[in-house]
A protein has these predicted regions:
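Transmembrane and membrane-interface helices of multi-pass
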Residues: 2-196
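A long, amphipathic alpha-helix that forms part
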Residues: 4, 365, 371-372, 412-458, ...
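Catalytic cores of PAPS-dependent sulfotransferases
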Residues: 73-82, 86, 315-325, 373-376, ...
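Active-site-proximal alpha/beta segments of enzymes that process anionic O-linked groups
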Residues: 176-244, 249-413, 489, 516, ...
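Active-site rim elements
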Residues: 190-196, 301-302, 351-354, 422-437, ...
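Active-site-flanking alpha-helical
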Residues: 255, 444, 470
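Histidine-centered active-site microenvironments of extracellular/periplasmic hydrolases
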Residues: 259-263, 452-455, 459-505, 539-541
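Flexible internal linker/loop segments at domain or repeat junctions
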Residues: 403-424, 500-508
Length: 553
């Protein structure tokens, strides 16, 4: 009897008060869970000396108290541990990616995560990530679940939660007043910091993604360009064949044809191309840029849209053209759902495919047969092929190229880019551009072979750029307003066959003069309609890159 009573008493005394879980959990999250944030804060020129230290302490107190305030609403005996587990694991994963790749977490990044396929996810896995998750996430979770919680009556628990919440608010107010001048100035001048507060950044971003569909006035897709018509061909004309190559993660500045010091585009240099160097992307991720590129709205209106509309691909289809989307990436992000599609992950090829991932060349495989399978009455009006590249998708750049394209050495053969020197990272990336150069050249050769029966042309534009270690930033996906230009400047390369130039009246020398013209993805929608000679109320000639370079036929 005495022994049993002693054990019960001991168990009771070893149990922790629920408020301690909230406070200590918040301290862990605000410190170790926010290493990426504190590294950024430490590098700020404004944060130095005693005043800088005071700001860091005040900022840390605000984060800790804010987390404690949130947890005070959720601090119920059977609910607290699962909630803290989610907080710890979310913070651990966020901390790893922010610290190692220099990314921030916003709604666009959460959208990228949701749309990531299995292969992309595996490319991000490495031992560094495992250790980070174990130390920052699993370790506190293990401690949490090993420690008993003191049982309180619900009225007592409610009172304690209110007390904890009030105390948290007082700390937030007090700390904010103490560092208000520095806090307001730093947060205004360094807006990226708000995307680093972990794990609140993830929870806020998830909330924005969940709420976004409800912000639209109409959940259905609104029709667009139903009046689209292709200009009638003259007796001597051939049906246009336009190949749209949607590049992936290609930096404009790493193309030899754009002045890069390395010969990354030897094949394109042999062709009669027009390369535009002043193009800015719509976003810094595929999930943002691709739907925006194929929208009539343009970047600003697309971001604030209240409705979803049919895309450029739909309008090409409405015009009666034969349209085919070939995807070697993670999908078309909704823009090609109403036209025929071919997914390369379903293919098997002894040299071009391995473990469900294919080199971009596979999209040229059996292409003639694919076109012949499209409706004949549409092919007589013209064909538009879209090829969505794997391109330079990171971080495993080395996986994107066959062995005979590993020209620039030494290369980084790891998906943990921070383990490699910047030279190795750049070499690996440049090898992907070298392979893209070869792929585009092969596509042009295929188009040339069809010139007897078609009027062929090619347009290559990338969705966004990439950071390769500049300022300790890797990959892409930073909020547009704080993203460096290397994530936003994209290549725009046009090849026109002699027949296409003649039929369309496009003047090559005029187009060459546009090399440094400031353009954006807003021009893409209207330029494609212009290339295919499609009339529609949604077409804006002023946004068509090629419009003022047409002769009067």
């Amino acid at each position: 009897m005495t022994s049993k009573s002693h054990r019960t008493s001991g168990s009771h005394h070893s149990a922790w008060h629920p408020a301690w879980f909230a406070v200590l959990g918040s301290l862990w999250l605000a410190s170790l869970g926010n290493i990426a944030l504190w590294m950024q804060v430490h590098q700020l020129p404004e944060v130095s000396g005693l005043r800088g230290f005071a700001f860091a302490v005040g900022f840390g107190a605000i984060i800790t108290a804010t987390l404690t305030l949130i947890l005070s609403f959720l601090n119920w005996r059977w609910f607290l541990k699962p909630v803290l587990t989610v907080f710890f694991l979310s913070a651990a994963s966020g901390a790893y990616f922010m610290m190692n790749y220099g990314i921030v977490i916003d709604s666009a990044m959460i959208t990228n995560v949701i749309q990531t396929d299995t292969q992309e996810a595996l490319d991000l896995m490495n031992w560094r990530m495992l250790i980070s998750l174990l130390l920052v996430g699993v370790l506190p979770c293990w401690t949490l679940w090993k420690t008993p919680v003191k049982s309180l009556r619900w009225t007592q628990q409610a009172f304690n939660n209110i007390l904890t919440g009030v105390a948290s608010v007082l700390v937030i107010v007090g700390a904010s007043l103490a560092v208000f001048q520095d806090f307001s100035s730093i947060m205004r001048n360094h807006t990226q910091l708000r995307y680093l507060v972990n794990p609140l950044n993830s929870f806020y971003a998830i909330g924005m993604v969940v709420a976004k569909p409800f912000q639209h006035n109409n959940q259905t897709l609104l029709p667009m360009g139903r009046d689209a018509k292709v200009a009638a061909l003259r007796p001597t004309d051939k049906p246009p064949l336009l190949l749209l190559v949607l590049g992936e993660t290609a930096r404009m500045g790493n193309f030899g044809v754009n002045g890069y010091e390395r010969p990354t585009t030897p094949e394109l240099a042999k062709e009669k191309i027009i390369s535009l160097k002043g193009v800015m992307s719509c976003g810094t991720s595929t999930a943002t840029s691709v739907p925006c590129m194929f929208s009539h709205l343009g970047k600003e209106a697309f971001e604030g849209r209240k409705n979803n509309y049919e895309s450029l691909i739909d309008i090409l289809n409405h015009a009666g053209l034969a349209v085919l989307w070939i995807d070697n990436q993670s999908g078309c992000k909704g823009v090609c759902e109403r036209v025929p599609q071919a997914l390369t992950k379903e293919l098997k090829h002894p040299t071009l495919c391995n473990n469900g991932e294919c080199f971009d060349e596979i999209m040229l495989h059996e292409l003639d047969q694919r076109i012949q399978s499209l409706p004949a009455e549409r092919r007589t009006k013209g064909v538009v092929l879209v090829m969505h590249q794997m391109g330079s998708h990171g971080p495993a750049y080395y996986k994107r190229v066959p062995d005979n394209f590993r020209k620039f050495q030494p290369e980084c053969k790891s998906n943990a880019l921070q383990e490699c020197s910047r030279e190795q990272v750049v070499n690996s990336f440049d090898n992907t551009i070298l392979y893209t150069d070869y792929f585009l050249a092969q596509a042009i050769q295929w188009l040339k072979k069809s010139e007897a029966t078609t009027s062929p042309a090619l347009l290559y534009v990338s969705d966004h750029g990439e950071s390769l270690g500049e300022n300790n930033l890797y990959l892409h996906g930073l909020p547009y307003r704080v993203a460096p230009d290397v994530q936003k400047r994209v290549p725009w390369i046009t090849w026109l066959s002699p027949r296409f130039e003649k039929q369309s009246g496009l003047i090559h020398t005029c187009l060459k003069n546009k090399t440094n013209t400031a353009l954006t993805h807003d021009n893409y929608f209207h330029s494609v309609l212009g290339l295919m000679n499609i009339s529609s109320e949604v077409y804006q000639e002023k946004l068509d890159v090629y419009a003022n370079c047409r002769s009067n036929l």
